Amino acid sequence: MGLIFFRYDRCYMLSVLSYLHVYFGPFRLLQSYAVLMGIALYAGFFFTYGVLPSAYRFLPQDRGRAFAPCAQEAAGKPTGAGVIFVSVFVLLVYLLMRPSFVHALILLLTWGVMLTGYLDDCAQVCWGEYRKGALDFLFAVLTAALLGHFYFHDQVFWWFPFFSDPVFVSPFLFFAGSVVILWMSINATNCTDGVDGLSGALVLMALLSMGTIFYFLLGNVRAAQYLLVPFVVDGAQWALMSFALAGALMGYVWRNAHPSTVLMGDAGSRALGFFIGVLVLISGNPFLLLMTSGVILVNGGTGLLKVVLLRFFHVRILSRVRFPLHDHMRENWHWSTAQVLLRFMILQGLLTIGLLGVLFKLR
């Protein structure tokens, strides 16, 4: 097994063509995960880019967020575009690979999270915070239990910087930690979806980062042995799924660039946050959430912490800071939409590169 090309053992629709390489040599490239990842990326982009405008008239209209700066800019635009690009993602995965039982479950759960968000986007009255939080918690609990039992078989090992050997994690601790990671990832990503292109661009960076890590590092035996990290047997398949969703998301971000013509809605943001959380759990290092989504967590997650402390413990923190943080930057620091987007992306890029070295080299 080489560093770049992986044998595509469980072939499916496109890879059937690879057997025709005796007649046309280039067909053998369809046995490579690298090629299939490229196909997933480009197919996801062009299909979403082409289909999305024709779906505008069928999508619900944004109601505008109460008390949010510039809410009038979003009001009336088609929203819930997540139903399009998440569905494209699921179809692409089934086209390019034969998902295992766990992969199929994750695809189903991702689509289910998207569906709950889409129903909220379509509702005449916005669902309450407790209702949405309870649904997110339910999906997090279900996913944590399924991964712990069917994927890790109740034998979970996490790897950390400064430790050369993986650390055994009890099933209860894995379950509790996974629920927190998934719930935070879903809601922090949802809170970040308030500036044209911001949430989509940051999640896109996270997906490409995770896909690259799964393919070149965790999913490669030699690289994993060298870095003293556990080898993920199906790492290339998780990488393909990451690139498929990244491609579909690119098609949406193209249309969501300022001034946007469509919004992803809860249908998109919640599903994206959920899938990022799943990738982090599969990787075996919860700190990868900081590496790939650190800006998302600070931008949206800190606001969630502020609300929880105030509402349930009557503890007030950061009272002079508006959350999500991008609202504070626009209202108090007078950043433009383009400045918020570019500066947040730069910060995330710096964070990703810095933590990549810390997590994988300081062993």
Swiss-Prot record:
Q: Give cofactor(s), names only.
A: Mg(2+)
Catalyzes what?
Answer: UDP-N-acetyl-alpha-D-muramoyl-L-alanyl-gamma-D-glutamyl-meso-2,6-diaminopimeloyl-D-alanyl-D-alanine + di-trans,octa-cis-undecaprenyl phosphate = di-trans,octa-cis-undecaprenyl diphospho-N-acetyl-alpha-D-muramoyl-L-alanyl-D-glutamyl-meso-2,6-diaminopimeloyl-D-alanyl-D-alanine + UMP
The UniProt record lists the EC number as 2.7.8.13
The UniProt keyword set, sorted, is: Cell cycle, Cell division, Cell inner membrane, Cell membrane, Cell shape, Cell wall biogenesis/degradation, Magnesium, Membrane, Metal-binding, Peptidoglycan synthesis, Transferase, Transmembrane, Transmembrane helix
In its keyword annotation, does this UniProt entry include Cell cycle?
Answer: yes
Q: Which family does it belong to?
A: Belongs to the glycosyltransferase 4 family. MraY subfamily.
Q: What is this protein called?
A: Phospho-N-acetylmuramoyl-pentapeptide-transferase
Q: What is the lineage of its organism?
A: Bacteria, Pseudomonadati, Spirochaetota, Spirochaetia, Spirochaetales
